[in-house]
Structures are given as structure tokens and as C-alpha cells.
């Protein structure tokens, strides 16, 4: 999981919740 810079088709981290979730990153 990547936090800020997400490669094409990569994932981004969501530290907003108790358990960090990974969401798809991209257009």
C-alpha cells in the first residue's frame, strides 16, 4: 500500500480509520 505517491494501478492508504485501509489509486 502506498500513502501518497501511488503508481498507476497502485493503492493508497487511508489512515483516517482505526484500521488503515487500502483503496485503489488512479483516475
From Swiss-Prot:
Matching InterPro entries: Neurhyp_horm, Neurohypophysial_hormone_CS
An annotated GO cellular component: extracellular region
Modified residue annotations for Glycine amide: 9
GO molecular function: neurohypophyseal hormone activity
Disulfide bonds: 1-6
Transmembrane segments: none
Key words, A-Z: Amidation, Cleavage on pair of basic residues, Disulfide bond, Hormone
Function: Vasotocin is an antidiuretic hormone.
Family listed: Belongs to the vasopressin/oxytocin family.
Name of this protein: Vasotocin-neurophysin VT
Species of the source: Sclerophrys regularis (Common African toad)
Amino acid at each position: 500500500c502506498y500513502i501518497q505517491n501511488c503508481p498507476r494501478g497502485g493503492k493508497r492508504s487511508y489512515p483516517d480509520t482505526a484500521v488503515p485501509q487500502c483503496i485503489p489509486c488512479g483516475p
